[in-house]
């Protein structure tokens, strides 16, 4: 691509494809920077850091001055960013085009600076309206908002804030809001034309999540209909931007080069079976043989990351005692991590130490960690693949794309020359797909279809999909919603469907909550749903601890032993929330209890946050959460209450059921496929269940049911009677 900032739009006689390719206005930074500016650590001010009314005016003035002084210092760093150096040209295109596509390579500063340029323009022209910046991940939304608030010289939640699922720091004063794509969709459900916003920025569009693709479709409808005044900026970290331009009628494409230093690539000579072990060994070798510099390790998921952190914590001191090498300090980084824990990753460490961050693909482009000189790439990621034939989501560990591999490697060359250690063979790298498959091509579209119905879209097949999921996927989504009671026989959204669309949950769990509100066990079901909403709440014990930990869990969960994992989660929640929360030393007591049962301490804190928010939502929707005393909310061993709770879950997960066979195996009700109870389940050794229900399906060497509960066949018949008749109908025929 030419590095000429004066290039112009292609002439009209070129073909459409050529026009798009040449309609790229590149801004390059030819000045070599000896050392990139350090990223100032993100403050942990995301927990409602507001100026108290009780503080004196003097304190407020001092706070204001310190914020502005900080912003002034950061401005010097901002001015060195490639994006900042082309501020005038970029803003010229944004102002004169309804849609602008901007390719900003990693390190260009697009995510922090472009929204601030637009905000300054709104101030200068005294225009009303706010700016929304979407992110595919909550951790990115939180960290970017925190950083930009610092650069803007304000407290988080004043002019700059964030809104993510179950956490919101915005106020009436907020003009620049970072939010997850899911939260913007939720705002669309409440305010169909998004009048609050003058500009909407879709960041990390190259990740092609289902929700991002859905937002692009909604935005195209808006600018072609009620909001021609709306300005849209689509930002991508990769060069594959032609599709975005074509979708928005050949919108101009701008290119800003990022800061890059050379990164040397290293590959394995032979494949490895144990990826966590290989990553640990690679980190130790780097620590023993390379100069100081932090290490960023990419692992497929939270489970592998927690395992790696645990192992590294155990061996780090021993390794540094054996040889004069830096002390390794390991940190996890994944989307489910609380904001306080996330902030530790970005803080510099003092002394003769080396930070090692174990991360999911969240660190590919969404966040920047200063000080990284080495990248260790497992070459793997976790994806959910929807199996239309089974009606189940399968969680798979799959190879990344070449584009992702390049993004990961680039993280080692942000501030200086670096090294990338790919834990796979070079011959395997060339076999990787060029780009990652769009999420919508492998996902269940039930939730997007519900949102479209809530929005008033009837012709789903011909809607302005950015990537049409196909007729089969759409019809199955419609059928699923019909069976859940969200749609009527004509495909119109029902009152139940309206309620489901407003809850920040998948439709199946929303259906469960609605049923619980009708039968009088909403508080208990909210507690269980909150536990299910947090990934990896129950950690996998080490092999030597497994039997002991399982015995402890079994001894505490008498009802769980009989009824399964959902009831077990409620029993554990009751102990954590009601019994351990009363003493003066509750925090320490809870931490010790979690460690003894191999339960995520961070996870349970997240559960409480999710629970609080769900109770707020449910009070608004149902007005039926009673303020009963604490003891009545606990589940105990009340068989009647437990049956009522499990029947509620059965209404949402009727397809996720299996019947016990004479040989003590299980076969799914919907397809007759064999399925096994996962070894981590409370019911793994229980061979006497007449039937089971599960909320998750995973496939390794065979199909496993997770979050398993015992059900009686009479319950199944009771709930299925109406659903079976509905399942035979083709929802598409009624449209």
UniProtKB/Swiss-Prot annotation:
Keywords: ATP-binding, Helicase, Hydrolase, Nucleotide-binding, Nucleus, RNA-binding, rRNA processing. It catalyses: ATP + H2O = ADP + phosphate + H(+). Probable ATP-binding RNA helicase. Required for 18S rRNA synthesis. The lineage of its organism: Eukaryota, Fungi, Dikarya, Ascomycota, Saccharomycotina. This is Probable ATP-dependent RNA helicase DHR2. Pfam families: DEAD, HA2_C, HA2_N, Helicase_C, OB_NTP_bind. Belongs to the DEAD box helicase family. DEAH subfamily. Its EC number is 3.6.4.13. Residues 1-29 are annotated as: Disordered. GO terms for cellular component: nucleolus; nucleoplasm; small-subunit processome. Its main location: nucleus. A motif (DEAH box) lies at residues 203-206. It is found in: Nucleus, Nucleolus. Residues 14-24 have a biased composition (Basic residues). SUPFAM superfamilies: P-loop containing nucleoside triphosphate hydrolases (SSF52540).
């Amino acid at each position: 691509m030419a590095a000429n900032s004066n290039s112009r739009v292609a002439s009209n006689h070129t073909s459409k494809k050529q026009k798009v390719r040449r309609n790229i206005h590149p801004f390059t930074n030819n000045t070599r920077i000896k050392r990139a500016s350090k990223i100032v650590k993100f403050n942990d001010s995301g927990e409602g850091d507001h100026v108290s009314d009780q503080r004196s005016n003097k304190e407020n003035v001092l706070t204001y001055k310190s914020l502005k002084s900080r912003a002034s210092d950061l401005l010097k760093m901002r001015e060195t960013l490639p994006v900042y150096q082309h501020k005038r040209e970029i803003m010229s295109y944004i102002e004169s085009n309804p849609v602008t596509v901007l390719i900003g390579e990693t390190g260009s500063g697009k995510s922090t600076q472009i929204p601030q340029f637009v905000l300054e323009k709104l101030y200068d022209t005294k225009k009303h309206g706010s700016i929304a910046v979407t992110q595919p991940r909550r951790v990115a939304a939180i960290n970017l908002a925190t950083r930009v608030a610092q650069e803007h010289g304000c407290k988080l939640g004043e002019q700059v804030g964030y809104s993510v699922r179950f956490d919101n720091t915005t106020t009436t004063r907020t003009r620049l809001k970072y939010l997850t794509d899911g939260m913007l969709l939720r705002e669309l459900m409440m305010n169909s034309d998004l009048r609050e916003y003058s500009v909407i920025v879709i960041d990390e569009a190259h990740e092609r999540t289902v929700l991002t693709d859905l937002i692009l479709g909604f935005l195209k409808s808006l600018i072609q209909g009620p909001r021609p005044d709306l300005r849209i900026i689509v930002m991508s970290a990769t060069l594959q931007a032609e599709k975005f331009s074509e979708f928005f009628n050949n919108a101009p494409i701008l290119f800003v080069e990022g800061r890059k230093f050379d990164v040397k690539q290293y590959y394995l000579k032979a494949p490895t079976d144990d990826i966590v072990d290989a990553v640990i060994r690679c980190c130790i070798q780097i620590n023993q043989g390379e100069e100081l510099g932090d290490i960023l390790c990419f692992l497929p998921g939270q489970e592998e990351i927690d395992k790696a952190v645990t192992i590294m914590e155990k061996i780090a001191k021993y390794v540094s005692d054996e040889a004069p090498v830096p002390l390794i300090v390991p940190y996890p980084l994944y989307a489910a991590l609380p904001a306080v824990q996330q902030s530790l990753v970005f803080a510099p460490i003092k002394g003769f130490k080396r930070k090692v961050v174990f991360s999911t693909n969240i660190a590919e482009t969404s966040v920047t960690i200063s000080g990284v000189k080495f990248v260790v790439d497992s070459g793997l990621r976790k994806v959910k693949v929807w199996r239309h034939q089974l009606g189940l989501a399968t969680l798979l560990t799959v190879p990344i794309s070449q584009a992702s591999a390049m993004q990961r490697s680039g993280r080692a060359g942000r501030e200086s020359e670096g090294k990338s250690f790919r834990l796979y063979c070079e011959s395997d790298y060339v076999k990787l797909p060029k780009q990652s498959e769009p999420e919508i091509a492998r996902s269940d579209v039930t939730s997007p279809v519900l949102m479209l119905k809530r929005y008033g879209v009837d012709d789903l097949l011909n809607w302005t999909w950015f990537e049409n999921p196909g007729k089969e996927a759409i019809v199955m989504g419609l059928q699923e919603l019909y069976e859940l009671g969200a749609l009527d026989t004509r495909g119109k959204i029902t009152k139940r469907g309206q309620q489901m669309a407003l809850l920040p949950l998948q439709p199946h769990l929303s259906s469960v909550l609605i049923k619980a509100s009708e039968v009088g066990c909403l508080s208990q079901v909210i507690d269980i749903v909150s536990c299910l909403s947090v990934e990896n709440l129950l950690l996998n014990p080490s092999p030597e601890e497994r039997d002991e930990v399982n015995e402890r869990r079994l001894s505490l969960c008498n009802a769980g032993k009989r009824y399964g994992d959902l009831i077990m989660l409620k029993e554990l929640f009751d102990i954590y929330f009601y019994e351990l929360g009363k003493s003066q030393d509750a925090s320490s007591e809870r931490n010790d209890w979690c460690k003894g049962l191999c339960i995520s301490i961070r996870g349970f804190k997240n559960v409480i946050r999710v629970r609080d928010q769900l109770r707020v939502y449910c009070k608004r929707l149902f007005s039926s959460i009673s303020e009963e005393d604490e003891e009545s909310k606990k589940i105990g061993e009340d068989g009647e209450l437990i049956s009522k709770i499990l029947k509620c879950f059965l209404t949402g997960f009727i397809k996720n059921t299996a019947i016990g066979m004479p040989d003590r195996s299980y076969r799914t009700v919907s397809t007759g496929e064999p399925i096994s109870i996962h070894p981590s389940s409370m019911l793994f050794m229980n061979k006497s269940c007449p039937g089971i229900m599960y909320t998750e399906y995973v496939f390794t060497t065979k199909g496993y049911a997770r979050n398993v509960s015992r059900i009686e066949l009479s319950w199944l018949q009771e709930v299925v009677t109406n659903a079976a008749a509905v399942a035979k109908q083709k929802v598409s025929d009624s449209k």
